C-alpha cells in the first residue's frame, strides 16, 4: 500500500470522532494567567492548545508555515465544541486542528515521493513526520484521529531514516508483564560500539520529535541516541504511566548489553520535562548502569505537589497529565492526590545522596519547573551541576544550553 493510500485509509470517515478538548472531563478552573515557557510554548487567547513555536521551529518547521496552518484553523466557520476556541472544530474536516496539520504533512509527503535526491527526499519525509506529530499534539489517550496521525508520523520517520546520514535501527524491547515496546537507535557514521544517550521525552511529545537533538548535538560528538515513547503514547501506548515512571526505560537499560552497536559501559540519560522524572529515578535505581544524567526543565516535585503551582498551569497541560495517568473523568482533587505520588521527593528519592553525576538546566520563572527543582536534583548528586538558561533571546539560548549540556554528557561518556 502506498503512503498516500495509507493516509486515505486511516482518515476515511467512519463515525463522528471525539474532539480533542473534550477527551478529559475535569472541572474547569476558569480564567488562568497567561503562560510562556521555552519548552512548552505559550497560551494564546482563544486556543485550547499551547502554541509551541520554538520547539516546532527547532524541529524544522518554517514559522510562516505555522502561521498559514493557524490561519486556516481560525478562518473556518465549521461547528466547534467551544465557539471561543479556534482549535475545537468537530470532525475531520477543514478547520480541525488534526485535519489542517495532517493536510500540510501530506504536501511534504508528496514532495518526498517526487524527489529523486535521496537526502532531500529524507528531509521532506522528516518534515512530514514532524507535521503529523503536531497534528496529533497533545497526544491525548482516546483521540482516534491523533493516533492515526501518529501512525503516519512513524511511517514517515522510518522513510526519512532510510535516506538521512548515519543509520537508524528500529529496536524491540521485551517488558515482562505486558506488550513489547519499540525504540529507535540513531547512530552516527563509524564503527561501534558507541557511547549512548537514552532519551526520556516530555509527556506531550513523541520519540520521533527528537531527531534535531541527535543530528545537531549528539551525532557530531559520535554519540548514539536511543529513544522510546513515554508510557501511554505511541509505541508504548499499551503501558499506563504509573508511580514507577522509569519502568520501561529501566528494562531498555538492562537490555543494552545485548545491543552490539551500544557500549553499555558508557550510557547516560537525558530527560526533558517529565522525562527528567524518569531520568532522575534511573540515576537512583540504576546508578551502576549510568555514567551521567542530564535534565532540562525538570518536573520532579513542585508541579506534582504544589496546588498553587498547578493552578498556574494551562488546562491543556493538566489534561495531558490526567490522560497519561488514565484519569479522564477524575475530579481535580483526585488528580492532585495522584500527582503528589509522582513527586520524587515524596517517593523518598530526591534529597537522598545519589552517586550518579547529575546536571539540571532551568529557566527563571518557569511555571512548570521552578529553580528549586533543579537545585534539589543537583544538590542530591555527589557530582551536581546547576545550569541557568537565560530566557531571551529564546532560540539562541536554547541552542547554547543544549550545547553545554551535551558537552557535559560527552565528558562523562567519552
Curated annotation (Swiss-Prot):
Gene3D superfamilies: alpha/beta hydrolase
GO MF terms held by the record: carboxylesterase activity
InterPro entries: AB_hydrolase_fold (IPR029058), FrsA (IPR043423), FrsA-like (IPR010520), FrsA_esterase (IPR050261)
Domain of life where this protein originates: Bacteria
Signal peptide: none
Role this protein plays: Catalyzes the hydrolysis of esters.
PANTHER family: DIENELACTONE HYDROLASE DOMAIN-CONTAINING PROTEIN-RELATED, ESTERASE FRSA
Family membership: Belongs to the FrsA family.
Protein name: Esterase FrsA
Species this protein is from: Shigella boydii serotype 18 (strain CDC 3083-94 / BS512)
Annotated gene: frsA
Amino acid at each position: 500500500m502506498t503512503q498516500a493510500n495509507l493516509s486515505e485509509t486511516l482518515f476515511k470517515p467512519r463515525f463522528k470522532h471525539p474532539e480533542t478538548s473534550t477527551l478529559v472531563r475535569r472541572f474547569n478552573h476558569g480564567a488562568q494567567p497567561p503562560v510562556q515557557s521555552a519548552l512548552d510554548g505559550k497560551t494564546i487567547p482563544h486556543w485550547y492548545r499551547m502554541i509551541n513555536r520554538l520547539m516546532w521551529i527547532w524541529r524544522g518547521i518554517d514559522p510562516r508555515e505555522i502561521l498559514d496552518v493557524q490561519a486556516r484553523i481560525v478562518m473556518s466557520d465549521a461547528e466547534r465544541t467551544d465557539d471561543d476556541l479556534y482549535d475545537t472544530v468537530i470532525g475531520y474536516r477543514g478547520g480541525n486542528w488534526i485535519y489542517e496539520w495532517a493536510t500540510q504533512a501530506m504536501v511534504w509527503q508528496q514532495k518526498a515521493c517526487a524527489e529523486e535526491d535521496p537526502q532531500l527526499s529524507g528531509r521532506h519525509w522528516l518534515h512530514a513526520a514532524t507535521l503529523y506529530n503536531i497534528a496529533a499534539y497533545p497526544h491525548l489517550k482516546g483521540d482516534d484521529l491523533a493516533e492515526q496521525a501518529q501512525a503516519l508520523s512513524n511511517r514517515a520517520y522510518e522513510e526519512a531514516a532510510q535516506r538521512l546520514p548515519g543509520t537508524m535501527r528500529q529496536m524491540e524491547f521485551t517488558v515482562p508483564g505486558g506488550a513489547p515496546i519499540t525504540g529507535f537507535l540513531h547512530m552516527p557514521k563509524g564503527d561501534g560500539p558507541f557511547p549512548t544517550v537514552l532519551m526520556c521525552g516530555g509527556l506531550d511529545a513523541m520519540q520521533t520529535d527528537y531527531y534535531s537533538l541527535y543530528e545537531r548535538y549528539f551525532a557530531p560528538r559520535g554519540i548514539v541516541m536511543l529513544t522510546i515513547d513515554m508510557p501511554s503514547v505511541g509505541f508504548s501506548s499499551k503501558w499506563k504511566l504509573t508511580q514507577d515512571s522509569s519502568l520501561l526505560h529501566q528494562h531498555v537499560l538492562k537490555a543494552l548489553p545485548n545491543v552490539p552497536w551500544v557500549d553499555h559501559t558508557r550510557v547516560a540519560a537525558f530527560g526533558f520535562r517529565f522525562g527528567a522524572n524518569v531520568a532522575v529515578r534511573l540515576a537512583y535505581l540504576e546508578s551502576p548502569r549510568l555514567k551521567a544524567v542530564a535534565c532540562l526543565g525538570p518536573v520532579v516535585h513542585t508541579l506534582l505537589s504544589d496546588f498553587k503551582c498547578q493552578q498556574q498551569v494551562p488546562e491543556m497541560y493538566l489534561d495531558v497529565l490526567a490522560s497519561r495517568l488514565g484519569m479522564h473523568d477524575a475530579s481535580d482533587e483526585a488528580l492532585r492526590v495522584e500527582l503528589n505520588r509522582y513527586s520524587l521527593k515524596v517517593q523518598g528519592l530526591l534529597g537522598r545522596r545519589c552517586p550518579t553525576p547529575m546536571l539540571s538546566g532551568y529557566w527563571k520563572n518557569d511555571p512548570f519547573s521552578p529553580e528549586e527543582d533543579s537545585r534539589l536534583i543537583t544538590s542530591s548528586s555527589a557530582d551536581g551541576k546547576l545550569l541557568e538558561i537565560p530566557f531571551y533571546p529564546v532560540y539562541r539560548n536554547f541552542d547554547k544550553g543544549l550545547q553545554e549540556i551535551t558537552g557535559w554528557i560527552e565528558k562523562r561518556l567519552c
